[in-house]
Amino acid sequence: IKSEIEISEFIVNDYVNDDNVDIVVKQGSMPEKIKKQRDEENIARFYDGNEIWFYIKNVGTYYIKEAKTILVEPEEGYIFNDLKAFLIWRSMAACLLQKDIVTIHGSAVIINEKAVIFTGRSGSGKSTLTAAFRKDTYKFLSDELCVLSIDEDQYPIVNPGYPQQRLAKNTLEGLGFNCNDFIISKESNQMYSVPANNDFVNTPIKLA
């Protein structure tokens, strides 16, 4: 990923260049057709295979094209962490959809050397359960989105995400953490960015 918007949560890859980059993230104005749909027709989201865009009030508009480009147009007075949150999760998920890559809405830990995914609706406790396993010394693989593929033995594997979780204030407090030690990731929902560098496994793991 090559991004004009700093995504401090992601692992830096010094070998990315214009020849091998998969996704380019740019910041700028939306195409006129999207502006018209958004501003005149009050449309907040659009999906048509190779083109996906969505609008988040007080945050910005995101346009994902052909699984290669993400264009972000911030709203005036936006909060950077909110802007970044919708880029990391919803926009990247749209790219995976366009690439026809199987992605599960869930979080994954490693149990008995296999990846276990906790999945469910938003707010069902996926990240909370994952954080509890992390606290009990289990290794961490991915939060919110689990990207699946098939290895050379035709076995499903879970690919690593990045070394961070997004947790709610009550979850952090319930697990005995001090919220003041973490950065707010999405201020409107009081979500905090929680590093997982010591628990993170940056290699694909077979699905349990």
Predicted regions and their residues:
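Glycine-rich, often acidic-flanked micro-motifs
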Residues: 1-14, 107, 111-121, 135-208
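Functionally constrained cores in energy, signaling, and assembly domains
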Residues: 3, 9, 27-28, 45, ...
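Post-Walker A alpha-helix
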Residues: 129-130
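Conserved lysine of the Walker
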Residues: 126
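Extreme N-terminal, non-catalytic leader segments
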Residues: 55-115, 192
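A generic structural signal for short, non-catalytic loop/turn and secondary-structure boundary residues
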Residues: 16-20, 47, 55, 65, ...
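Long, basic/Gly/Ser/Thr-rich N-terminal segments
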Residues: 1-79
